[in-house]
Amino acid sequence: VNSTNKLTPSSLREAFGHFPTGVVAIAAEVDGVRQGLAASTFVPVSLEPPLVSFCVQNTSTTWPKLTGVPMLGISVLGEAHDAAVRTLAAKTGDRFAGLETVSNDAGAVFIKGTSVWLESAIEQLVPAGDHTIVVLRVNQVKVDPNVAPIVFHRSVLRRLGV
């Protein structure tokens, strides 16, 4: 470590950004309209029962729309979705512009061409500072091993080196 920064939200954001993560889309149909958000805080939690989690900012205006649906679709984004990540993370506009999606009977929305689809239901919400940890129970999974991942590192989307 070369230097010590004063502990501030921006210094923490910079420090946390040094940890590379994947990016997922969390989406569902709400009253016939696709709603969704991007998250780089996705984490597998448990195999038995099958649980995953992600964190969402308490100030999110999209998350309250998703909390009442029976099922959420989680799509693990790949290299082809670098532009989509910014669109999904936008504060305004159509977050699904230019994206092909599929909805299932439970209302979960998935993005085509991603490496993993997880149909999930909210299991638990855990308050954690300025975020909420969302624990989801996985009901169905679909995997495409041929889709290369995208990595979010230091606020830049990168491809995984081979």
Descriptions of predicted regions:
Residues 1-162:
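Basic, polyanion-binding surface patches
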